[in-house]
A protein has these predicted regions:
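Intrinsic-disorder/low-complexity detector
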Residues: 1-183
Length: 183
């Protein structure tokens, strides 16, 4: 399996879906401060995500989209800087969020306490994230990868990576950052 092509397929599917929902711009954003946190977040997330994947695959995948949104929100609020007051947030952002209510309720914590959503916005984001996770899971399942193999692990990480970047893109647009050509 060509992982770059697989990851690109995930990215294109998510982008087209979110574009149709007006949740992202034509051009996906770049935000190096958020993107550079991916590796550390993935390393800490993987033990939890892998453990949950067999029983709750869309939650295991979807939580990463919420994490991408939360990191973008923290970035916008300038809470990711080295001189930020909260060292536990800057040192291990995933563990910080997970430990607030536990892995199972991290989605609710992010929607309520980080993104400050209520009512229809809260429910709409839950549906949007669920649909994105389901789309990614569907693509993954159709790859004919042997479960538990090195290839399966790499594919799972690719799925998480695209959902993280997608979460970042959705949140950046929601906060008013638009990726459009300057005239």
């Amino acid at each position: 399996m060509k992982f770059n092509a697989f990851e690109e397929k995930l990215q294109q599917d998510l982008h087209q879906y979110l574009l149709s929902m007006n949740e992202v711009d034509n051009h996906m954003p770049e935000c190096p401060d958020v993107e550079e946190r991916w590796e550390q977040i993935a390393q800490t997330y993987l033990p939890d995500g892998i453990r949950e994947f067999n029983d709750y695959p869309t939650a295991s995948l979807g939580w990463m989209m919420y994490i991408g949104m939360a990191v973008a929100k923290y970035w916008d609020a300038e809470l990711l800087t080295a001189d930020a007051n909260n060292r536990s947030l800057t040192d291990n952002i995933y563990a910080y969020m997970r430990d607030k209510r536990g892995y199972d309720h991290m989605d609710e914590y992010i929607r309520e306490e980080v993104l400050l959503l209520k009512g229809n916005e809260y429910t709409a984001l839950e549906k949007l994230t669920g649909e994105c996770a389901s789309r990614v899971y569907n693509i993954l399942r159709h790859q004919n990868i042997e479960p538990g193999s090195k290839e399966a692990f790499r594919a799972y990480v690719a799925c998480l990576h695209q959902l993280y970047l997608t979460g970042m893109a959705v949140q950046l647009k929601r906060m008013g950052y638009h990726m459009e050509k300057m005239s």
